[in-house]
A protein has these predicted regions:
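N-terminal accessory/interface modules of nucleic-acid-binding and processing proteins
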Residues: 1-177, 182
Length: 185
C-alpha cells in the first residue's frame, strides 16, 4: 500500500480551531442547509449509534445528543456518508473507507475529537478496502480531497472558521470615548 508523508508545514498551518457549543450549533445549521441544497432531508432520531445516510429515502438520520457537539458529530457522519454515496464510483468497501475518512476530516475541521469508534471504523475499512482488487490509495485520496472541497464549499465550513478565527484575533472596534481615552494615554 502506498504511503503519503506530508512535511510538517503542510498540516501544522491548517490545525483545527477550537469551537464552542454555540459555534457547533451554527455548524449544525450550516450542514443541514447544505444537505437541503442537495435535496437531502435530515431527521433526528431518539436512538443511540452513529449518524447514517438512508439512500433509498434520501434522508440523513442523526441521533439526538446530550449536547451540540454530539449532534454535530452524528450529523457529520451522516453527511459524509451521503456525499460519498452520491459521488463514489468505487466498490462498497472503498466507499466505506472514504466515508469514514471524510467523517474524520470534517470532525477535525470542526474541532470535534476523533473517538476510538471512528478510528476503529477507519482501520477496519482500510483493511477491507485493501482486499478489493484494483484498490488505489492515491485514487481514494483524490476522491476524498474532492469530497472535502465539496463539503467545505457547500457547508461553508471554511468561511465559518475564518469568521470565528477573525473574531478571536481582531480586537473589538473602539468607541469614540475609548479612542479619546487612548489618545490621552
Amino acid at each position: 500500500m502506498e504511503q503519503y508523508d506530508l512535511p510538517e508545514s503542510e498540516y501544522l498551518d491548517k490545525a483545527p480551531l477550537q469551537w464552542t457549543e454555540a459555534q457547533h450549533s451554527d455548524l449544525i445549521h450550516r450542514v443541514e442547509d447544505a444537505a437541503q441544497l442537495a435535496d437531502i432531508s435530515v431527521l433526528s432520531d431518539l436512538r443511540h449509534g452513529t449518524g447514517f445516510f438512508d439512500a433509498s429515502r434520501n434522508v440523513i438520520h442523526i441521533r439526538e445528543g446530550n449536547n451540540s457537539t454530539e449532534q454535530l458529530k452524528s450529523l457529520l457522519e451522516g453527511y459524509s456518508e451521503a456525499v460519498i454515496t452520491r459521488t463514489s464510483t468505487s466498490d462498497k468497501p472503498v466507499a466505506e473507507l472514504e466515508s469514514a475518512a471524510l467523517t474524520a476530516l470534517l470532525q477535525v475541521r470542526c474541532g470535534v475529537p476523533i473517538d476510538d469508534q471512528l478510528a476503529e471504523r477507519i482501520t477496519a475499512a482500510l483493511e477491507d478496502a485493501g482486499n478489493v482488487g484494483g484498490f488505489s490509495m492515491r485514487d481514494s485520496v483524490a476522491r476524498l480531497h474532492n469530497a472535502m472541497e465539496y463539503c467545505v464549499r457547500y457547508a461553508e465550513l471554511e468561511q465559518t472558521s475564518e469568521q470565528y478565527q477573525a473574531q478571536q484575533i481582531e480586537p473589538e472596534e473602539l468607541t469614540p470615548q475609548s479612542e479619546a481615552f487612548m489618545e490621552m494615554m
